[in-house]
Amino acid sequence: KPYISTSDEHIEDGTSTENSQEILKMTEKRSRKMETLKDNLPEPTYYGNSQAKKIFVGWGSSKNVILDIINNTDTNIGYLHYEYIYPLKTEKLEELINNDKELVLIESNQTGELGKLIKEETGYEFKEKLLKFDGRPFFVEDILDFLK
């Protein structure tokens, strides 16, 4: 059975409308929900030496391999891990930016999606990126080779 959808706005009871006042009301309602969500989401978590100059910023599967390096080598790095990327929380990230840390974007995709979102939200553009997009996870060697 096909699914049919309208491109019009819907109102509280789920029916569609083209009424501009109702559209404005529903758009504002979604905006309030997004602000509430942002207020309740945690900041990203920082791992590693707080004095580290080189800090990786990432999300998803890069976390475990970075923590492996932090916990099992003498490599002096930090890692800022985003568990939720939208709406983006930026307070901890902006502290790192303002403290002249060397930030490295680490992502398992070709285009650096999180980096683009960070640039859109903060204006910060990563000078260094470690992107892997061959379908394989990051390995400790990938990061250690990058750091050489």
What does each model-found stretch correspond to?
Residues 1-148:
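Flexible, low-complexity linker and terminal segments
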